[in-house]
Amino acid sequence: MPHTDSRGTIRRRPREAIRTLAAFGVFAFLVGGSFAAQQPAGPPILQEPQTVLLWPNGAPGAQGTEDRDKPAITVYMPPNTTGPMTAVIVAPGGSYRALAANLEGRAPANYFNTLGIAAFVLRYRLGPQYHHPIELGDAQRAIRTVRARAAEWHIAADRIGFIGFSAGGHLASSASTHFDDGNASATDPIDRVSSRPDFAILGYPVISLIEPWTHQGSKTNLLGDAPDPALARSLSSETQVTASTPPTFIYQTNADTTTPAENAVSYYLALRKAGVPAEMHIFKDGRHGSGLGMTDPALSEWPKLLTNWLRASGLLK
């Protein structure tokens, strides 16, 4: 059975580490041989993924004691890598009601590991049991946790990003537009550090919570059946961008009818207007929820474009 230590780390069973090793091998193959050529000879040294509770003594506002009531990050460390590393928090989508934990969580984490980037897959609380500000608070706590423990995890505290897909993309854009520097006098040292991500990556994101482009399911699960229009507008990320919003990479498809491309475009234009470095790629075809797009010859190019952006942004060694 898993064991939770005093820091909220849940120790996993050995067979889970074996599955992770196999998954890593698949993704190292998919991204090509250039990464492998740069690595030292010998087998990769993989650390077993560990799940860390964001609040080991119980999350604020928790309504139960099941896993769904316990926001957490699962830590994926790249092999044969010494710090300080770039890190990214991964928020799977699922309309703020479920989490696509493999397609939009574990798979991207393994991909980032092939680039030498540490990845932290976020398990955040969901509707209809939980509503705003719980989800945003979980995301902010994840950023603070990684930053506060950066030295322990050999991470560069100023290179911590946030990637989200679909509703997770809305969470990523919300974390990018609603953050603070931390409370220097807080009792909890994690609360003393900034919740601002240093960069953001959005995959076919929900952005707007106002008509006509919102995804109604995500909006309802996040805000409830009859939300205050002012609150919905304040959480429509295209209305909240400032010059302090972090540099952002956006991936979208024109054929997406679940979250129309107008979501991504409106956010990109807001970033451009605010002078925030941003790059967006809209593919002609492709369904919503394609993850890394590895089953589609065209869509599978977007992780490569992301890699180029990360390198140009100084986020890869």
Mark where each language-model region is.
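C-terminal catalytic histidine-bearing segment of alpha/beta-hydrolase fold enzymes
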Residues: 76, 251, 261, 265-317
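Short beta-strand/loop motif that positions the catalytic acidic residue
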Residues: 250-252, 256
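Catalytic nucleophile-loop/oxyanion-hole region of alpha/beta-hydrolase
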Residues: 100-102, 106-108, 122-157, 293-301
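Active-site glycine-rich loops that stabilize anionic/oxyanionic intermediates
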Residues: 92-97, 254
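Bacterial N-terminal signal peptides
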Residues: 21-33
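N-terminal cap/lid segment of alpha/beta-hydrolase-fold proteins
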Residues: 39-83
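Primarily recognizes the serine-hydrolase "nucleophile elbow" in alpha/beta-hydrolase
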Residues: 141-218, 232-233, 237
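Short beta-strand element of the alpha/beta-hydrolase
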Residues: 84-93
